[in-house]
From Swiss-Prot:
It catalyses: UDP-2-N,3-O-bis[(3R)-3-hydroxytetradecanoyl]-alpha-D-glucosamine + H2O = 2-N,3-O-bis[(3R)-3-hydroxytetradecanoyl]-alpha-D-glucosaminyl 1-phosphate + UMP + 2 H(+). Belongs to the LpxH family. It comes from Mannheimia succiniciproducens (strain KCTC 0769BP / MBEL55E). Its EC number is 3.6.1.54. Mn(2+) 1 binds at D9, H11, D42, H198. Binds 2 Mn(2+) ions per subunit in a binuclear metal center. This is UDP-2,3-diacylglucosamine hydrolase. Pathway: Glycolipid biosynthesis; lipid IV(A) biosynthesis; lipid IV(A) from (3R)-3-hydroxytetradecanoyl-[acyl-carrier-protein] and UDP-N-acetyl-alpha-D-glucosamine: step 4/6. Substrate binds at N80, R81, D123, S161, K165, K168, H196.
Length: 240
């Protein structure tokens, strides 16, 4: 049976080895069954440049390369934590980078895929920050800094983000329903898949739209969406 897998928001880091093991289990035992695998952002908890080397990065690189060498394409849309992941890393393992919004045909259904952070328009402070850090000249300047300095800056931003989340309401950090409907109309699709909010669900939106939200990963649970010609559902998946 033809099938495609979607994952996002793993937030892999050196201090979460069980998460890395869970990702490796997925890539070794589940992903090879697919026609394609889509990673919709925040694969890593942070990314400061393709020049960083670590055991974690090498392990993830190896898993993606093993999959793509089996002629199973692996696609990636940048998240808010790993938007600096670049062509150098992608080329090293066969990962295919996609734009922020991409329409893919899933067994006859045109589907818009994205990370999901752009849909959270009520979070004005975040959207302002996002526009700034996505400016190419800022990114080029940042990548010119020494690696140790970039890591310190990323860690500071990450800690500030955690603090800000505690101060924001759940509604602000979720998607804006009106904007979502505008996106459906703009791209002329009836189905959307995204991550970012960590609120795994399949929403039916009248009159005929479907919005599928990928969940985040935990040490003992992986949010994996399987799409086939017959059905769309989340796999039950626990740590190995």
């Amino acid at each position: 049976m033809k099938k495609t897998y979607f994952i996002s928001d793993l937030h892999l880091s050196e201090n979460r080895p069980k998460l890395t093991a869970l990702f490796e289990h997925f890539m070794h035992n589940i992903a090879p069954q697919a026609q394609a695998v889509y990673i919709l952002g925040d694969l890593f908890d942070f990314w400061v440049g393709d020049d960083e080397k670590s055991p974690l990065i090498s392990r993830v690189q190896a898993q993606i390369k093993q999959l793509t060498e089996k002629n199973i394409p692996c696609y990636f849309i940048h998240g808010n934590r790993d938007f600096l992941l670049g062509e150098k890393f992608a080329e090293s393992c066969g990962l295919q980078l996609l734009p922020d919004y991409k329409i893919v045909n899933l067994y006859g259904t045109d589907t818009l895929i994205c990370h999901g952070d752009t849909l959270c328009t009520d979070d004005v402070n975040y959207q302002t920050f996002r526009r700034k850090v996505h400016q190419k000249w800022r990114q080029r300047l940042f990548l010119l800094l020494p690696l140790k300095v970039r890591i310190k800056i990323a860690d500071k931003i990450r800690r500030q983000s955690r603090h800000d989340k505690k101060m924001k309401s759940a509604e602000i950090m979720d998607v804006n329903g009106e904007f979502v409907c505008q996106i459906f109309e703009r791209f002329n699709v009836r189905q959307m898949i995204h991550g970012h909010t960590h609120r795994q669900n399949i929403h039916q939106i009248p009159p005929h739209f479907k919005r599928i939200v990928l969940g985040d990963w935990h040490d003992d649970y992986a949010s994996i969406l399987e799409v086939s010609e017959q059905e769309t559902y989340f796999l039950p998946q626990t740590a190995r």
